[in-house]
Amino acid sequence: MPADDDDASYLLCAEDAGAAVFDVAVDISTCTTEDDECCSVGGEELYSAASIAELIGGEAEYSPRSDYPDRLRSRSIDPAARAESVSWILKVQEYNGFLPLTAYLAVNYMDRFLSLRHLPEGQGWAMQLLAVACLSLAAKMEETLVPSLLDLQVECSRYVFEPRTICRMEFLILTALNWRLRSVTPFTFIDFFACKHISNAMVQNANSDIQFLDHCPSSMAAAAVLCATGETPSLAFVNPELAVNWCIGLAEEGISSCYQLMQQLVIGNVQRSAAAAAAVNLFSDEGLSYDSSSPPPPKRRKRSPPGT
């Protein structure tokens, strides 16, 4: 922690410390955007195409200012300090078992704040305090169990801040971001983009095979998503064992069986269809084509039967 509270005097605000804590604890949970649909859901809600389009239209409101990346590249904002803060956030996320969305939101709050406000230069504790406060706010938004502000700093190596100091920083962040914490994130779109096209097509193809009648809809949906992610090398680690944790009630055996069947029948049929189409194109483009400028092949003379 900084040696003297005066070092953090820029964090002081007119409100009583208790009021600041109350604001953080109560108002964050009730704050809403102007449009209730513009919120992060972490994959728990389904959106229509119109809702997704509306979210895309409003996502810039939850992003840093447009000049922020250039300020990082030009080092007017220290990119190394930002990278260190992001690394710390990811370590604490893993240590506490937080959702990936929580870490993403913390970095989002930090970037948005840095694009709007200036931290004291040469004060390493200020950047770390910002990271702690942003992660605290993100955890309050998304996590069921939130560690105490002291426990949240278990991975901090240089400074440990008092709860009241963190709460003051939280209040500054909330003010700078206009209390807009329900950010639109990549997690908002993943379900829609991934399932709408690839997974839906797989379920549709599977519908024609009677072997899938042995499987419940939830297993088919999980298997379709697994097949879709299997086509992406970076997502090859996703498997039925992980899929069973997506929702209470899913059975690993059912998902695994349906997944194997879908790989054999649906993906196999698609590959065979593609191969057949390629073969047809090959014959039509090469085997059955000839140069119209060249003379036609000579006709064979019909041989007469002997004795004629």
From Swiss-Prot:
- Enumerate the residue ranges of region (Disordered): 286-308
Which gene produces this protein?
A: CYCD2-1
| Biased amino acid composition, Basic residues | 298-308
Look up keyword Glycosyltransferase and say if it applies: no
**Which spans of this chain does the record mark as coiled coil?**
none
The record's annotation in InterPro entries points to: Cyclin, Cyclin-like_dom, Cyclin-like_sf, Cyclin_C-dom, Cyclin_N, Cyclins_cyclin-box
What Gene Ontology cellular-component terms does the record carry? Answer: cyclin-dependent protein kinase holoenzyme complex; cytoplasm; nucleus
Q: Which UniProt keywords apply?
A: Cell cycle, Cell division, Cyclin
- Please tell me the species this chain comes from: Oryza sativa subsp. japonica (Rice)
Under PANTHER family, the record lists:
CYCLINS
Q: Which Pfam families match?
A: Cyclin_C, Cyclin_N
Q: What is this protein called?
A: Cyclin-D2-1
* Family affiliation: Belongs to the cyclin family. Cyclin D subfamily.
Q: Which cysteines are joined by disulfide bonds?
A: none
Please name the GO terms of the biological process aspect recorded for this protein, alphabetically. cell division; G1/S transition of mitotic cell cycle
GO MF, one example: cyclin-dependent protein serine/threonine kinase regulator activity
